[in-house]
Amino acid sequence: MDTSYLYSYNAERYQKLAERKLPCREKLNTTEVEQGYLLPNRFAKNRLFGCGGVLDAEKNYVKASEMNAYAKYAVPVTAQDEKEIYLGEGYAIDDNKVEYLDEEIIYLGYINNHWGHFLIDCSTRLYYYLEHMDENHKYAFLVNENEDYQAIAPIRRFFELLGIAECLIFIHKVTKCKKVIIPEQGYMINAYYSKQFLHVFERVAESVDCSRYPSYEKVYYSRNQFRKAKGTEIGENILLDLFSKNGFKIISPEQLTLDEQIAVVRNTKLLCGIVGTLGHNMLFAKPEQHMILVNKTHNINVAQMDINKMKNLDMTYIDSYLAKFPSLIGNGPFLITYSEMLNQYVESHNWKKPAEDVISETVLKRNLQEYEEMYRSRNLKNLRLVYERTRTDLIILHRIIFWNLRCGFIIWNILRR
């Protein structure tokens, strides 16, 4: 992993994580629960996903059904570190509303329609299917309580390529089963991985005939057609101009089928994109493929660091952002700039620089203003959700936030002169 193009305070953090070994688990356990209850996901403030999982016949929660991670630790994990619980804890159930399945059910955890979470969180028990394909089992994903879940196209195609599509059921009501078999997670963020977990992605990728699709020397994954990115990221036009000038094919992955996305990953020598879910697609890559990820925040995507190790990727990180205000990695907003680190990469590789009209001071000021306005609107919404303020309180908070942001912008401009 090349960290030469990271800000100095970031480089040390990345290097420490890169040096940490990610253990490869050879044996994965299973837990069997007779007359177990499947609990669909119920919203909980202190969980990434919520409450849900499996209860035993006496309605005690089965810890093996939790979904866990160590994603919040941007440093090597120790035995004393507490696991994050993405899905966990039971809840009271009404026996009169419980459905019953007189079958053995394989528990797969929770699923939603976020592609990134599907790849690294929701797929971790699918390996069990590959090891028991000759057995006539049903495989159950939990979905949100009372939700009529319909998988998005890439997830649906993933199941088809794996061969499990016809075996799946989605649990949106409390359901009691003759037996529930709970495979252990095949991968836990920042804790361990397994060959079994990787076999799932190898099986899916090998089910696509990549020879039917074009091959590329260099591809840049753009997010400018991604709806969420339009509301959280500013300045990608700098990268679009830079990479198009230097021979990269510009591709918007959300406009491709899963087969096409897999073919792009496996048929391209050098892939590049902004850090995020795009990099997680490298789970479909061949070992030792080369990728460049441009950072939009100081927050480290720990799952991506794991993927780099699992697939032995030739990864280069470049810092090219201005973080004027704190923001969560999944929230934003993010301001992408033509940083000194990106310029160093461009010069060291004899690349053409972006056009002046996308990296000028005038453009930077305009992007900064848009960034401030976006930050203000997004965080005002967060205040409304968290504190449930009245309209009058929100107007006062809006004025305070606006004043502080404007003062910060004025001070920043004075310091730059």
Language-model segment annotations:
Residues 1-414:
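The feature primarily captures lumenal catalytic ectodomains
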